[in-house]
């Protein structure tokens, strides 16, 4: 996983270093196999098409903006867990409410000001944070970085393991 490890370190600095040796990428075979899924312990399930030649023994196609963005989204869920967020529990509730109320759990309000965008990120749900990060990484891979994301990138890259908002605990 050398290609993927370099990608992780560029985006997250040392924040995921403890997780990298045990991180495993799998082809998603259950549920909606077109979608990615992140579980605790560095387990990430991705569509077969995300791997070079659709072979899960080959590297991810990280030059493709969508592949890089979705992988980054799932990596952010790993990062959130290390920050103390109960990602699986929170995401389950978000998706359940989305199904019942027809709300997009990924939708967020983008803004041009980096400070406001950072506050949006800090206040966001786990899926909104994942989508914000995905949009940031897709723009980077396309060679069109979004200036409004610079403080978010700095925050994620410099975060230390175990930093949580007051009152948050990890449940998964």
Regions found by a protein language model. Give the residues of each.
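Catalytic Zn2+-binding segment of zinc metalloproteases
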Residues: 74-93
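Sec-exported extracytoplasmic/periplasmic mature domains
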Residues: 12-13, 80, 84, 135-139
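Auxiliary, metal-adjacent structural segments of Zn-dependent hydrolase domains
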Residues: 1-44, 48
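Extracytoplasmic/secreted proteins, especially bacterial periplasmic and envelope-associated proteins
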Residues: 3, 66, 70, 129-132
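Short pre-active-site segment immediately N-terminal to the catalytic Zn-binding motif
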Residues: 35-36, 48-72, 118-122
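Metalloprotease/metallohydrolase-associated module, dominated by Zn2+-dependent proteases
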Residues: 41, 89-172
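Generic structural signal for small/hydrophobic residues in well-ordered secondary structure
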Residues: 8, 71-73, 77, 130
